[in-house]
């Protein structure tokens, strides 16, 4: 195999050097695969140790095989017990009422999950009595949950009859809390409080009754669950026997060794198929199959998280153009930016706090007011006491809980960021000083996705700044201009990245002293840390490249498309007004669709403020281009009202509208809801044709799903990549008990398409598929012209010395993509595939697509 790889892929090095590189790559992939396997096994063992082994996927699959028959057995046993209790063994009779009081589905899931979890934790045998008691305790908790839900229904009915809206909302919030309970002690306390408030007494079963109920279910499981050995003989999966060598009679629950071996094998197999992916020290092998490409040893699918329906479509269609596009993306070789790496190491290792890196110490936790009288190890017991529960419901207690939750959330984020930094350092160590490659594959809608996790152009600002092209290209005078644009775009403050190109080029002249000082000593001259927080490291890398001629030959320069989703929508519908706003034509200046949307929104807000509207008055000084950016960009993706509210609230949070626990304040959400209601009308004023096309897609999807119950799919233009939207009402059947969550896969033939979710996703998925197609066309044409190229959605990157030529390619491929009527092509595909009458296509605009070829701000 190694000789075949060397002979088939190596082009520039000697055989011995190539063999050394391939051996290094195989060792690297094996190490990463082993690391991923070890992490998967450790995670599974931790779940088993906690008694949650039944939640692991191999255990769930085994339960799914038995569940249907076992549920029928329990249902029949309960039916007999109700009609003729004398037929139930006297030993189990005390627990009869507890099993009858819960549904057979819940009782079955509780018994099977508990038994499998216990035998996985104790393979040599688990206490029978303890297991039965645990099952009985969980059944008692389920009975209490049922009682609380019944009381809440009665309370809601009384409030509805009395017209008490506040009471209805309180009951709804309480119902949500009840559904989220995961601790039987909390359930018991809540049920006791609720029944006491209603003047009732909570009915609870004694320990003997609970144990007998659990024992009855264990007996039913023993009689029902069998496994088939290799010699085709059937044996019981569980057995109960007296513990050997003990004088006192003690029963033990055992699992069949073949069953435990099967579970262990499943856990190891699941851990083995999720390896981590390293960089490549040799050029990635070409994709030749949907499951083989990108790596020498590691096997990953060409589409991330493809479902069964999508995999079937991939197998049915010609993927040769798709393979060629991904191979073109995998073509560029990189090297580490040593100066950026050294700066990072110094700041990370020698400084505790730095604005461009996550702090290495957790923030100080909020002080617990009763810490002097409640020891830390007694807090959870005190919290359940009457005194603790009363204090936590008070204003002071509620505020402290909000602060504590915000602190925990912040600590988790910081831990994830620190882990990312460590993994990035590890990847940089693997890269060393030699050339390396970054393999890519596709997301389900056809967008590019790097297979390496931390060191790639889609990861953090720091990771992107660490990447240099391995091949040198002289920038020349033309390239120096694009390097100046890179500096202005990465600085980002004072609107430099939004100014006309001629002004952005002058950024270097106005900031030359700062650029040279930062490039000479970034640790002493830290002005670069004050730039746009999203691109600080890239600005530092651009300063170093401007100052160092050798680095300039390898440094990347990037251009961004102007709201690329709207560009595709405007081109597809030939909407001239929207095309002008997103720079599909040369108007003599850089158009700003976010600014135009903000101006229209501000007019509406000012009109409301003039009428004395509360939120209109508060929002007059807040509406600007930055506030409207996300809602405008995502409108053609089918963003919902709730999504717009979250987007506006996030921006207001950055402006000081925060709650004590972190996150947007309630006032920020009210103001955001006020603004979000106006955005659809604002976007319709900007470009009606593109909005009509989105509505046509949504209406067509509704008709198709309601008439055929088939997933929505199409082939992307030119490339022919099959896209499938697998939005299902139930991919798995969820059975929720107070302690367990059991997931069982629904057979493909029984799957029901989720119409609402698909309608919401169609606009975004179709636009992203066009975005991914444009990216692959760019990559293939750049490869044909020997230009190193990488992309991050609508951000295109290459050497500064080749950027002028590459920009022309980006515009040409965009025109080539939209040359035909993509609306008609989509309608024809759907009509032919689903045999459904679709609504008529909306009227097309008059945009001249060739204007893109002369627009300087199409990608800038």
Regions picked out by a protein language model, each given a short descriptive name:
Residues 1-632, 638-766, 781-789, 804-808, ...:
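Non-catalytic nucleic-acid-binding interfaces of large nucleic-acid enzymes and RNP effectors
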Residues 765, 769-774, 778, 787-802:
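C-terminal, well-structured subdomains that either form a transmembrane helix-short loop-helix hairpin
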């Amino acid at each position: 195999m190694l000789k075949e790889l060397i002979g088939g892929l190596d082009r520039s090095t000697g055989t011995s050097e190539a063999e050394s590189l391939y051996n290094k790559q195989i060792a690297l992939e094996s190490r990463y695969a082993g690391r991923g396997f070890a992490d998967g096994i450790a995670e599974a063992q931790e779940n088993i140790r906690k008694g949650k082994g039944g939640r692991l996927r191999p255990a769930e699959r085994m339960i799914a095989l038995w569940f249907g028959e076992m549920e029928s057995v329990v249902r029949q046993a309960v039916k007999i017990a109700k009609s003729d209790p004398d037929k139930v063994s006297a030993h189990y009779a005390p627990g009869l009422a507890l099993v009858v009081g819960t549904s057979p589905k819940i009782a079955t899931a509780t018994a099977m999950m508990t038994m499998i979890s216990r035998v996985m934790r104790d393979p040599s045998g688990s206490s029978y009595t303890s297991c039965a008691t645990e099952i009985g305790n969980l059944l008692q908790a389920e009975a209490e949950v049922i009682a609380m839900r019944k009381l809440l229904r009665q309370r809601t009915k009384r409030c509805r009859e009395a017209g008490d809206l506040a009471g209805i909302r309180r009951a709804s919030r309480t119902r949500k809390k009840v559904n989220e309970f995961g601790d039987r002690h909390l359930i018991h306390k809540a049920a006791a409080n609720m029944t006491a408030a209603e003047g009732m007494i909570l009915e609870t079963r004694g320990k003997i009754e609970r144990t007998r109920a659990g024992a009855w279910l264990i007996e039913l499981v023993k009689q029902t669950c069998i496994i088939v050995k290799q010699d085709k003989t059937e044996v019981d999966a569980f057995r109960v026997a007296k513990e050997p060598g003990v004088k006192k009679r003690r029963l033990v629950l055992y699992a069949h060794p073949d069953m435990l071996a099967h579970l262990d094998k499943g856990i190891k197999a699941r851990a083995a198929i999720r390896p981590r992916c390293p960089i490549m020290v040799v050029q990635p092998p070409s994709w030749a199959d949907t499951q083989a490409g990108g790596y020498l040893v590691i096997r990953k699918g060409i589409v991330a998280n493809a479902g069964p329906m999508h995999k079937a479509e991939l197998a049915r269609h010609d993927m040769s153009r798709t393979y060629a596009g991904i191979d073109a993306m995998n073509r560029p070789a990189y090297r580490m930016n040593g100066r950026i790496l050294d700066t990072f190491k110094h700041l990370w290792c020698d400084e505790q706090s730095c604005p461009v890196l996550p702090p290495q110490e957790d923030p100080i936790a909020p002080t617990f007011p009763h810490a002097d009288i409640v020891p830390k190890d007694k807090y959870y017991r005190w919290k359940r006491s009457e005194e603790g529960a009363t204090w936590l419901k008070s204003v002071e207690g509620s505020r402290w809980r909000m602060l504590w939750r915000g602190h925990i959330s912040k600590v988790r984020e910081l831990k994830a960021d620190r882990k990312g930094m460590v993994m990035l350092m590890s990847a940089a160590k693997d890269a060393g000083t030699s050339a390396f490659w970054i393999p890519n594959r596709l997301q389900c809608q056809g967008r590019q996705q790097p297979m390496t996790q931390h060191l790639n152009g889609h990861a953090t600002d720091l990771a992107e700044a660490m990447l240099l092209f391995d091949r040198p290209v002289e920038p020349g005078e033309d390239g120096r201009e694009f390097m100046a644009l890179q500096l202005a775009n990465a600085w980002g403050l004072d609107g430099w990245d939004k100014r006309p190109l001629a002004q952005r080029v002058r950024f270097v002249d106005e900031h030359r002293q700062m650029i040279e000082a930062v490039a000479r000593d970034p640790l002493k001259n830290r002005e670069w840390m004050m730039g746009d927080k999203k691109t600080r490291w890239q600005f530092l890398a651009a300063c170093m490249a401007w100052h160092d001629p050798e680095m300039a030959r390898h440094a990347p320069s990037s251009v961004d498309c102007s709201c690329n989703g709207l560009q595709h929508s405007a081109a597809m519908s030939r909407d001239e007004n929207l095309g002008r706003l997103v720079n599909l034509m040369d108007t003599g200046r850089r158009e700003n669709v976010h600014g135009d949307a903000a101006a229209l929104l501000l007019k509406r807000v000012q009109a409301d403020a003039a009428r004395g509207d509360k939120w209109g008055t508060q929002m007059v000084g807040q509406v600007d281009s930055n506030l409207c950016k996300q809602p405008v960009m995502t409108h053609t993706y089918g963003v919902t009202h709730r999504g717009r509210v979250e987007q506006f609230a996030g921006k207001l949070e950055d402006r000081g509208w925060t709650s004590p626990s972190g996150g947007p304040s309630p006032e920020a959400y009210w103001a955001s809801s006020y603004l979000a209601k106006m955005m659809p009308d604002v976007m319709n004023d900007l470009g009606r044709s593109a909005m009509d096309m989105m509505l046509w897609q949504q209406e067509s999807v509704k008709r198709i799903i309601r008439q055929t119950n088939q997933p929505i799919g199409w082939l992307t233009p030119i490339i022919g990549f099959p896209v499938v939207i697998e939005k299902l009402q139930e991919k798995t059947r969820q059975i929720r008990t107070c302690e367990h969550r059991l997931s069982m896969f629904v057979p493909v033939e029984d799957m029901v398409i989720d119409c609402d979710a698909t309608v919401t996703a169609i606009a975004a998925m179709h636009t992203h598929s066009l975005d991914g197609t444009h990216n692959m066309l760019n990559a293939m044409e750049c490869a044909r012209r020997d230009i190193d190229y990488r992309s991050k959605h609508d951000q295109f990157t290459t050497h500064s010395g080749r950027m002028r030529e590459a920009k022309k390619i980006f515009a040409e491929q965009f025109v080539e993509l939209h040359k035909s009527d993509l609306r008609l092509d989509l309608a024809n595909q759907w009509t032919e595939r689903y045999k459904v009458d679709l609504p008529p296509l909306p009227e097309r605009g008059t945009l001249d697509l060739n204007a893109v070829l002369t627009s300087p701000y199409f990608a800038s």
